[in-house]
Swiss-Prot record:
Subunit and interaction comment: Homotetramer, a dimer of dimers. One homotetramer interacts with 1 SecA dimer.
Descriptive protein name: Protein-export protein SecB
Keywords per UniProt: Chaperone, Cytoplasm, Protein transport, Translocation, Transport
NCBIfam families to which the protein is assigned, alphabetical: PRK05751.1-4, secB
Species of provenance: Psychrobacter sp. (strain PRwf-1)
GO CC terms, sorted: cytoplasm
Length: 151
C-alpha cells in the first residue's frame, strides 16, 4: 500500500550511444598540394523522437565544410545518436532535456568522431570547440516566443 502511495521518482538515463551515420567527402587530390589554411563552416542540428512512452532517440548532427584557398577541401559529417530514458519528469522540462542536456552528452562523442575521420582523411587534426547547448536552446526558445508575439 505504501508503495502505491509513493510518488514515482523521476528517471533520466543514457541507455545507449552510437554513431548512426558518418562520412568524409574529400573534394579532390589537389587539395593536398596547397598550403593548409582552411576556412571552416560548422553546423549543428539536433532532432529528438520518442521510441516509446519512456525512451527517446536524440540525434546530434555535426557538419563541417572546409575550404582551402577558396576551393572545397572536405565535408565531414556525423550523426551521433543516443537513446535516453526519460520517465516521470514534468512535461515542461522534457524539451530542455532533449534540446540541451542530451546534446551536451552527445557532443564529446561527435567531436571525437569528426576529429578521427578528418585525421584519417590525411588532414591536420580538427578539434571542435565546446558548445553551450543550454544557451543555444534558450535562444531558440526565445526566437519561438518572439515569433509567436509577432504573429
Amino acid at each position: 500500500m505504501a508503495e502505491q502511495q509513493a510518488q514515482a521518482q523521476p528517471q533520466l538515463a543514457l541507455e545507449r550511444i552510437y554513431v548512426k551515420d558518418m562520412s568524409l567527402e574529400v573534394a579532390g587530390a589537389e587539395v593536398f598540394t596547397k598550403e593548409w589554411q582552411p576556412e571552416l563552416d560548422i553546423n549543428l542540428a539536433t532532432t529528438a523522437e520518442p521510441l516509446d512512452e519512456d525512451h527517446y532517440q536524440v540525434i546530434l548532427t555535426v557538419t563541417v565544410n572546409a575550404q582551402n584557398a577558396g576551393a572545397a577541401a572536405f565535408i565531414a559529417e556525423v550523426h551521433q545518436a543516443g537513446i535516453f530514458l526519460i520517465k516521470d519528469i514534468p512535461e515542461d522540462q522534457v524539451g530542455q532535456i532533449l534540446g540541451a542536456y542530451c546534446p551536451n552528452i552527445l557532443f564529446p562523442y561527435a567531436r571525437e568522431v569528426i576529429s578521427d575521420i578528418v585525421t584519417r582523411g590525411s588532414f591536420p587534426q580538427l578539434l571542435l570547440a565546446p558548445v553551450n547547448f543550454d544557451q543555444a536552446y534558450a535562444q531558440s526558445q526565445q526566437q519561438v516566443t518572439d515569433g509567436e508575439g509577432n504573429a
